[in-house]
Amino acid sequence: MGELTSVEICAGAGGQALGLEQAGFRHQAAVEIDADACGTLRSNRGSEWKIIEDDVANVDGHAFHQVDLLAGGVPCPPFSIAGKQLGAGDDRDLFPQALRLVAEIAPRAVLLENVRGLGTRRFESYRCQVLARLRGLGYETWWDLVHASEHGVPQLRPRFVLVAVRQPWAGWFRWPEPLPGPAPTVGATLHDLMAAGGWPGAAAWSQRAGTIAPTIVGGSKKHGGPDLGPTRARAAWRRLGVDGLGIADDIPGPDFPAGQLPKLTVRMVARLQGFPDSWVIAGRKTAAYRQVGNAFPPPVARSLGTAIAAALCRGNVSPAAADVAHHASLA
């Protein structure tokens, strides 16, 4: 089988797209409406991915008929615990557009991620409608809650993930196993960045920040400047030795006041999300933080993409036929 192809919708800063690329998928297109996020995508993969700066509602899926994978992080406000949870009644709900594209593209597999709020009982009827539509299009479907910390990301970040695969490949799909051992800590992940400016408190800070981070919250354009979330989240950051009331322009230097908690920079937040340091984030600080904070961690996308790729690369042999062949070889 040749290389696997994909289309990414609601691509944002490219976290999911990057992880899927690392899993072996070549993106035929990355669709994103936000200008700053498109700047990020072009800065990093402008010569390799077709960047479509447009509303996903305007994208004709027939142009990408039968790519291997349709993936995306559809907007979460309709289902977010922090929001009003309007679900299908929210005009920001892009699941209908995603399902339209599934019908037009007819990919072999689908990967859509959202906040864990979508997995609550309140939205059970909505989930059933989505699954019924996908099954009507010939897909086997799975929902699961995936924790970023189980895939090498120093952050809790539970996400509700939908995977749909057509036969005969569906029988081969297995959810990725958590990585062995504990997740890296915030201190271990960021120590070199905190120390790079000569801050003498970096080593002690790293020891204090000896656990994973709470879920990073990117927020929306309706809110003001960037910060690390609501009161409860900021309290969790404070226990890690981080001032969550804003995002820093620069790393702490040698004259950083003793007893004062440092703030994270956008680059630090990107690293906590699993982005490589080489990944350029376009836009001013608030826009850059919003992109990073709302991203799907690349390592999680890589794990999911690897699992999907493994199923798709089994060819046209069904699991049942493979079992028959295996038992015949032992006879």
Stretches found by the model and what they are:
Residues 59-69, 77-239, 318:
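Class I S-adenosyl-L-methionine
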Residues 9-13:
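Class I SAM-dependent methyltransferase "Motif I" SAM/SAH-binding loop
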Residues 195-331:
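C-terminal target-recognition/interaction regions appended to catalytic cores
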Residues 19-26, 44:
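A short, Lys/Arg-enriched amphipathic alpha-helix followed by its capping loop at the start of a domain
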Residues 31-34, 113-114:
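Conserved acidic E/D residue at the C-terminus of a beta-strand in Rossmann-like folds
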Residues 48-55:
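Conserved SAM-binding strand-loop segment of SAM-dependent methyltransferases
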Residues 35-39:
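Short alpha-helix immediately C-terminal to the canonical SAM-binding loop
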